[in-house]
Every structure is written in C-alpha cells, then in structure tokens.
A protein has these predicted regions:
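Internal alpha-helical scaffold of NAD(P)-dependent oxidoreductase catalytic cores
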Residues: 174, 203-216, 233-281, 285-320
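Asparagine/serine/threonine-enriched low-complexity, disordered tracts
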Residues: 105, 112-114, 122, 132-134, ...
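Short acidic low-complexity segments
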Residues: 88-103, 138-152
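Short, low-complexity intrinsically disordered segments enriched in A/P/G/S/L with frequent Arg
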Residues: 18-19, 29-30, 108, 118-119, ...
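NAD(P)-dependent Rossmann-like dehydrogenase/reductase catalytic/cofactor-binding core
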Residues: 276, 283-287, 312-322, 326, ...
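Rossmann-like NAD(P)(H) cofactor-binding subdomain of soluble oxidoreductases
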Residues: 97-98, 148-233, 249
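NAD(P)+-binding Rossmann beta1-loop-alpha1 motif at the extreme N-terminus of oxidoreductases
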Residues: 2, 31-85, 93-94
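Intrinsically disordered, low-complexity repeat/linker tracts enriched for polar/charged residues
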Residues: 6-17, 21-28, 32, 115, ...
Length: 418
C-alpha cells in the first residue's frame, strides 16, 4: 500500500473539503491514490468502480463477459442505469491477470468476436458474472503482493454470490505469500452459498484459510445502485474483524454523499444483507396482492425477527440487525421501487411464473438463491422462519402466493417473542 507497511492500514480523519463545487462529492483526500481492482462489472460493480475512480483512485474493472466489457468501453454507459456515465479513468478488461496486476498494461484493443463467442452468456448471466468454468472462463491469476511493483492495494468483489468462490480460487494468494502481504478484499456481493451455506466472506476464507480472515472486509447497507450512481446520499457500513481494515475501507469509499460507518460483526452484516432479500420477495408478494400497509408493516417486522433468530443462532449479535445492514437494508428493499427482489415478488403475485418474472427483470434476483440457503440454515440450526419457509415454497415448490398467505396467517397463536 502506497507509503505504508503492507501489514498496516493508514488511519485518517474524514474531513469534508469545503471549497469544492456541490457536484464534486468527495472528501479531503486522506489516502494517496490507491490501486483498486473491481471484480464484476455489472451494475453494482461498475458504479462502485466509477465512485472510486472519481475519488482519484486508479481503478481496473474486470468481468468474465466480453460483451459487457466491450459495451461499457464503447458507450461509457449501462443500459440498466439511464443517465449514468462510467468514469473516464476506469480501465475495463476481460483479462483477469491484467485486472489484478498493475504492472501489466490494460489492453485498449476492441474485444474480438472470438472472445465474445467464447463467453456464451445471456444478458442475465452476464450481469451475474456467472463463473461456472465453462469455455471462455479465465485462467487462474495470482495477485502480486501489496507493495510489489504491480500489486493492487485493494480488491473489490462485486460479482453475484454464486461466482465468488470461483473468484477466490482463481485469485488465491501464492502459497509462500504471508497473509499480511495479501491485498485486502472488500466483499460487496450479498448472498449465502447454497452448498456450503456460508456468506461471501466465509466463502473466501474457506478457500484461502483462516489466517486470511483479517484481510477480508464487507461493505453493506441500504444502497440502491441507481441512487449511488446518481450520487444521492447513501449510508453503509464496512465490517471486518480487523479494525484497521474496516477504517481503511471507510476512508477508501467515503465521500460527503456516500457515508461509511465501521463494524466488527462481519457475520451479522452479511446475514442482514442477504436475508433481507428473501423478506423483500415476500413484501413484493404482499404489495402485488394489494394486502395493504398493515400487512407490509407486519411482514417487515416479523421478517426482521426471523433474521435476528437465525443470526443469533449462528453467532451474530442481535443489535447488528437493528443497524444499517439489517433494518436499514430491510426497509429499503421491502419498500423501495428500485428493489429487484420486491419487484420479483410483485410479479409473482400478479400471476407471472418464476421464470417469467426473472426474465422480465433481466438481472440477478439474489433472494431466489438465498431463500434456499436460508431455509437450509434454519432447518440445520432448528430456527423457526415461517416467512422464509413460505417464500421457499413459492419459489422452489410451486406453491401459490395465495396459499402461502393463507398458511402464514393461519398459524397457531403464540407470543410475539416466538
């Protein structure tokens, strides 16, 4: 890391720079320009890449989908983000080795047809940064150490949840590289892996080993991509078991329009950001069936109770779910018109099939996968999650939303704490 020991992250004061025009939403630069690799150039990844580039950092954004990268290069825009312009200084590539090694130049040549054909992804898969090892998938790329000639200072993970394990495996630190020399990874992807039932930071740790835990952070909170793209006020939290890392991530991302708080309950932050997507699908069903504000308020409240029950059973702190990554993200995703998961639930309530609703949205609906993982975790740990159970039944067992509502409302009487 520029000007610092590889083991340390610089402390800073978040001083607003008062003499900048209102359109320039940045802080007094407390960090020297950092070399940042963003893995995943879907809507969230490219907005975060542009955010960091506009703060003065050197940013490379990678995606497995050649057509996505070439479109971004040619238009500096994204079809799902009207009016958004990619920061001019963001370097875009489909070459993973280029993305993680700043000693290599990023090719500016147009991506050839043979490369685009090798990456046989439809638009929905491209947004997901699908990484299943099919033809055209990148080779492994060892990330140079922090402080080396080409080493990035930070890696931001913005791929869909089902691609995170592959990224961790492809970018595994060299066997002889101490954890303290490994660039920190900031996980901005939300989800729970279906096979391992691990959240995303846990997935990376399971690939690299426990000694790397302090090199992993999570950025999460109520943050619609389209509003971050428009530089509307947004507040999130940076969580890590390493307080110096959470402070570093705070400083890296924070502006006077993108406020970041630090946290140390990584598990709670990740579970909050993942489980709320399942509850948001239920809220969308509620609104699609026109059940009223009373029903939505009850669903959000009881959904939060389910999140807390599962989180505490897994070792998270209950108070984390009252914060930005829990209640904050839950309210936004259940009530906001920009929520994919809420929209997905609304479409189901109005008669669309699961596949029709997914196709109409055209982007990843993380709650679809998380419903399966959350239910499996609840069964494994003996946690009662009736809303999650009914969402799972609608999505994966063909149950109608009307029948799910009837079963939820027909449950036996019990104390609220249950």
């Amino acid at each position: 890391m520029t000007g610092t020991s590889p083991a340390e992250f610089p402390r800073s004061e978040h001083r607003l720079q008062p003499d900048l025009p209102r359109s320039e939403h940045r802080l007094q630069p407390d960090l020297p320009p950092q070399k940042v690799t963003v893995l995943g150039a879907g809507v969230w990844g490219i907005v975060l890449a542009s955010h960091l580039a506009r703060k003065g950092h050197v940013v490379r954004a990678w995606d497995v989908a050649a057509q996505v990268v070439e479109r971004l290069r040619q238009t500096l825009s994204h079809p799902k983000l009207p009016g958004f312009r990619v920061a001019d200084t963001v370097q875009l590539t489909t070459n993973l080795a280029e993305a993680v090694d700043f000693s290599k130049n990023c090719s500016s040549e147009p991506i050839g047809e043979h490369q685009a054909e090798a990456c046989t992804l439809n638009e929905n898969q491209a947004e997901a940064c699908t990484l299943n090892g099919e033809e055209g998938a990148p080779r492994a790329a060892l990330i140079p150490a922090v402080g080396s000639k080409g080493g990035p200072d930070c890696v931001v993970v913005a791929a869909a949840s089902h691609g995170v394990r592959a990224l961790a495996e492809w970018c595994r630190p060299p066997a002889d590289q101490p954890p303290r020399q490994t660039p920190p990874w900031v996980v901005c992807s939300k989800g729970i892996e279906e096979d391992s039932l691990l959240p995303m930071a846990g997935v990376i740790e399971s690939v690299w080993g426990a000694p790397y835990r302090d090199r992993i952070a999570v950025l999460s909170g109520p943050s619609f991509t389209a509003e971050v793209a428009r530089q509307l006020p947004t507040t999130v939290c940076a969580a890590s078991t390493n307080p110096r890392l959470s402070e570093y991530v705070q400083t890296l991302f924070m502006t006077n329009r993108f406020r970041v708080y630090t946290q140390d309950d990584v598990l709670g932050v990740e579970l909050g950001g993942s489980l709320k997507n399942v509850i948001a699908i239920a809220a969308g069903v509620c609104d699609g069936m026109e059940l009223g504000d009373n029903a939505r308020a009850a669903l959000i409240t009881r959904g939060l109770a389910e999140m807390i029950r599962l989180g505490t059973a897994l070792g998270a702190r209950p108070e984390t779910f009252a914060g930005l990554a829990g209640m904050g993200d839950l309210i936004l995703t259940c009530c906001g018109s920009l929520s994919r998961n809420h929209t997905f639930g609304t479409l189901l309530a109005r008669g669309r099939t699961v596949q029709e609703a997914l196709a109409e949205i055209g982007m990843v609906v993380e709650g679809m996968r998380t419903a399966r993982s959350a239910r499996a975790l609840a069964l494994k740990h003996g946690v009662t999650m009736p809303i999650v159970e009914e969402v799972y039944a609608v999505l994966h067992e063909g149950k109608s939303p009307q029948a799910a509502l009837q079963d939820l409302m027909g449950r036996g009487a019990r104390p609220e704490r249950d």
